[in-house]
């Protein structure tokens, strides 16, 4: 995700190559291309540290507000991000330290991504703005299964 197109000096226009690259990335993500989704998750979570986990927990009210804003069509997203947040909260309670287990790093990335309004697909786009968020969260849950929904962690 760090290699997303950068805007040139004209703020309202992107070079055609950058527009095409971003469009291609969105299309592959929304089509469910597992390789693309995994690459985004790995790139986004590789530098996640315990301080990031603790920071996202401090932002839980923003996450809760986002839950309330999530439309009915995204019931599964709401459930999955709540499970991730519960796991992250449990990890924070026992003062999880670096290096974080992969499931916690990716769970933290998923929560951070959900909070971003302007990610690959801006959340403000009616009906589809949360599609990329839902795909990434679902993929993180699928990658780690019960590790993201169990209690009594020993970090």
Features from the language model and the residues they span:
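Terminal, membrane-proximal amphipathic helices
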Residues: 1-108, 138, 142-155
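Membrane-inserting effector segments that mediate pore formation, membrane fusion
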Residues: 101-136
């Amino acid at each position: 995700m760090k290699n997303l197109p950068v805007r040139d000096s004209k703020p309202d226009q992107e070079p055609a190559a950058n527009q095409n690259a971003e469009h291609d990335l969105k299309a592959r993500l929304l089509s469910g291309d597992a390789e693309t989704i995994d690459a985004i998750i790995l790139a986004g979570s590789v530098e996640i540290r315990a301080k990031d986990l603790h920071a996202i927990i401090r932002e839980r009210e923003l996450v809760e507000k986002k839950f309330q804003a999530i439309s009915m069509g995204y019931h599964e997203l709401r459930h999955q991000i709540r499970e991730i947040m519960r796991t992250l909260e449990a990890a924070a309670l026992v003062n999880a330290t670096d290096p974080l287990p992969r499931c916690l790093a990716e769970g933290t990335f998923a929560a951070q991504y959900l909070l971003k309004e302007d990610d690959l697909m801006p959340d403000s786009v009616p009906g589809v703005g949360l599609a990329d968020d839902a795909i990434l969260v679902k993929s993180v849950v699928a990658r780690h299964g019960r590790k993201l929904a169990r209690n009594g962690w020993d970090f």
